[in-house]
């Protein structure tokens, strides 16, 4: 008889953690912050990438810690990727991205790539709305953010041999 091991946590359970953790948060464009991790999760190519995508902003943007997530039953491979994906404010952003690229953790690399692609897509749309409204301050802010995301995506793709946007 062959035993099939069941993951300790389902995609639905990780989505619920993200829903609860991001409740009430808004993004720069005024939309619910949760829409971004959902989009990043849906870009995943396997269950681990989907779960990591759903949770990728939880430690960075909410009160939950990696230990809290471990206590909720999040798998160790997801936690390892989340540790790499959590940016410490004291660390240079591009060093952080370089660390992900050089880690060899395929889940973290794929999720960060998906994160950057989605952030850039959102940023370009929000920039267009700001331009239509004549909001030059928002346009300048978004131009800097979009440029940072382009550079990070390029850095990640060059280090990992993936295709850039």
Feature annotation, model-predicted:
Residues 2-165:
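Active-site helical microenvironments for divalent-metal-assisted chemistry
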